[in-house]
A protein has these predicted regions:
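N-terminal intrinsically disordered, low-complexity segments enriched in P/E/S/T
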Residues: 19-136
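Bacterial N-terminal signal peptides
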Residues: 2-15
Length: 136
């Protein structure tokens, strides 16, 4: 069974896909579905660590209620990820491993440079440390 960390579905109907993305080789960490044009699995776009890193990572330091002091997060900008899959929706529905779900307007993800973090302070995030992916 694959590890699905996040399910980003768009509050719109699914359209026919326009492009085939490369299939991941490693363990799947992220599954995107909904109103996306580019997929690599039936109606979905799935990613492992390597395929996420190929999109280009950014880092920034911030404080948060989840970590002590200033923390460096490194990950893929959600804006870039949404462009890569050809997302056409306006809302991201994000579901974590523990079934916690939240909704983020896509415009907020773009306006505030939200990232999908893979690393915290230079280390890959583990499940027990809020990983393996974390929306920041």
């Amino acid at each position: 069974m694959r590890l699905i960390v996040l399910l980003l579905s768009f509050v719109v109907t699914i359209q026919a896909w326009a492009g085939e993305l490369p299939k991941p080789v490693g363990k799947v960490l992220l599954t995107l579905s909904g109103n996306i044009e580019n997929t690599n699995e039936e109606g979905k776009a799935v990613f492992d660590i390597a395929s996420l890193e190929k999109l280009g990572l950014v880092s920034f330091k911030t404080t948060s209620p989840w970590y002590d002091g200033r923390t460096t997060f490194t990950g893929v900008p959600l804006k870039k990820l949404m462009e890569y899959v050809g997302a056409k929706g306006s809302v991201l529905k994000i579901t974590a491993l523990n079934d916690y779900t939240t909704v983020i307007p896509l415009s907020d993800a773009q306006k505030y440079n939200v990232i999908l973090a893979l690393k915290v302070n230079g280390e890959y995030m583990r499940i027990r440390d809020k990983g393996p992916l974390f929306v920041v």
